[in-house]
């Protein structure tokens, strides 16, 4: 799990820095990525690039990992502090969310969003 956690820590740092190319390089070519704005999923690196381009044109999201754990099927579960502002700096969201990552060949293959463990405890 440690190697995957280290990769994900970098992914969060790169996302928050808007270094899209580095984040996308950590993803499998055929990644399935949760669309937290519009629902459903986007597919492939190009789908994620398009989604983030739309997202970052309207909001300024930042996500900070708080806790990492391993799920029953080997997935990495991350409890995340999510802070979202509009482009004028107005706070839109400040909450905990759950992120679930599945890896293939050392790359992120799937990303899903769920309630954080603290919300269900």
Predicted features and spans:
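Short, low-complexity N-terminal intrinsically disordered segments enriched in polar/charged residues
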Residues: 1-29, 119-121
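A beta-strand edge to alpha-helix "cap/lid" segment located at domain peripheries
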Residues: 3, 49-121
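Generic recognition of short, well-ordered alpha-helical interface segments
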Residues: 3-6, 18, 43, 47, ...
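Hydrophobic pocket/interface hotspot
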Residues: 8-11, 23-24, 31, 44, ...
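Short acidic/polar alpha-helix capping motifs at helix-coil junctions
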Residues: 14-16, 28-32, 49, 60-65
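A short gly/proline-enriched turn/hairpin at secondary-structure junctions
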Residues: 32-42, 54-58, 114
């Amino acid at each position: 799990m440690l190697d995957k956690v280290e990769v994900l820590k970098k992914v969060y740092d790169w996302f928050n820095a808007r270094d899209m190319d580095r984040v996308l390089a950590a993803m499998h070519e055929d990644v399935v990525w949760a669309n937290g704005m519009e629902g459903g999923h986007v597919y492939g690196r190009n789908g994620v690039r398009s989604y983030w381009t739309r997202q970052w044109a309207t909001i300024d999201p930042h996500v900070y990992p708080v806790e990492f754990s391993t799920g029953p099927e080997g997935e990495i579960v991350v409890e995340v502090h999510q802070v979202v502002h509009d482009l004028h700096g107005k706070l839109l969201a400040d909450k905990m969310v759950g992120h679930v990552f599945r890896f293939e060949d050392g790359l992120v293959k799937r990303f899903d969003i769920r309630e954080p463990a603290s919300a269900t405890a």
